[in-house]
Structure formats: C-alpha cells, structure tokens
Amino acid sequence: MSKSYQNTIPLFLEEKQLRKHINKIKTNLLEPGEPKNPDDSTVFQIFRAFASVEKSDQMRKDFADGIAWGEAKYRLFELVNSELEEPRERYFELLANPQKVEKLLQQGAEKARSDSKNLMKSLRHAVGLRSLD
C-alpha cells in the first residue's frame, strides 16, 4: 500500500471510515470456494500484522479453503477495529485536549532534564571533567 496511490489505511480512522478503507483493498478475481494464496494477499498481510499466530494460521487455512473476499475483509475489519478501539479513543481524547498534551510533554521534558543532568554529571566524573567551582 502506498500513500501516493491513496490506498493507505490511517490507523485512527473512525469505525465507519476504517470499514470503508478496508473494503477498498484490491483483491483478485477468485470466486468463493476457490483456494487463495495468502502470501499474495494484502488482506492477509494486514490481518497477520494484527492477529495472533493461531488466528493467522486459521486465516491461512481459510484462504486455502477458498474464503470469500467479503468475509476475509469483514474478519480483517473486526480484528483491526477491536485492536485499535482503545488507542483510537485515546487519540481523539488527546486531540480534544491540547492542554493535556502540553502538560504531558512538559512532564516528559522535566524528567528527561533530570535524568540527563545526573547522567552527564557521572559521565564528566568518569572522563575526568570536573567542575571548576
């Protein structure tokens, strides 16, 4: 999939849009019941990225048994949607609260400064660069 071809699936799409993007995935013309090669299928490749080994193995078997493309896309949508539901909610929560994002960034910066200050102090001591105070 390529962004320049406008065939990407942004991770934090709302459910309806996510379904629409998944349904647009190009597939070959093999009919239901005809064995399909999962290694040549974008649907399977994306499914495998989100699924457990067991689910991937089952889907691979279903491809060999000739799963219909509509069913394969439906299963892909269900899996991706369930995996991204919580992160999507968090994403929209953060988008709606820029003050919260700023606060989190400031807290992270303070922690990083504190950690790096202690590290730099020990590094200077280790290489013999001591304060002139």
Language-model-derived ranges and their functions:
Residues 1-133:
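Conserved nucleotide- and phosphate/pyrophosphate-binding catalytic cores
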